[in-house]
Amino acid sequence: YNLDNGLIISTNYNYISEVGELTAYQPNRIQGTSVGTSRPKNRYKLSVNHPRAFNDNIGYAITARYTEKYWYDNYLWYGIGELGGNLNIDTQVSYILKDYNILLKAGINNLLGQYYNTSVLTPKIGSTFYITIDYDGLIK
């Protein structure tokens, strides 16, 4: 939703239904056993941002994502295990230099610093800090 004051609110919801019997190719797997989709059944996302919240050149963005716990089964390549159940919050502030058509941004991904995996037996993902400089002739 784009509000009259410039605030933008967006949400996203993903639902994955496990339909039928999904059987992974594994020589040692018991015949007839089923595995999950290796994806969370429910995922949620909420974003709030305002590119010109203060003084018409200072903005912010906050995004929260939640992934429900799920059973990850990729025994052939990565293994099996429980993933998800993590809340990630990303934040960003921005500053527009109107005279130079430049947008400066600084932010933190995974503000809470809770390490998480997107696959089993892989390195965990932590926080990322970033600074960007965008030049665009349309920034005024």
Language-model features, listed with the residues they occupy:
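Gram-negative outer-membrane beta-barrel transporters
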Residues: 1-72
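C-terminal beta-signal and adjacent terminal beta-strands/loops
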Residues: 6-9, 65-74, 82-84, 88, ...
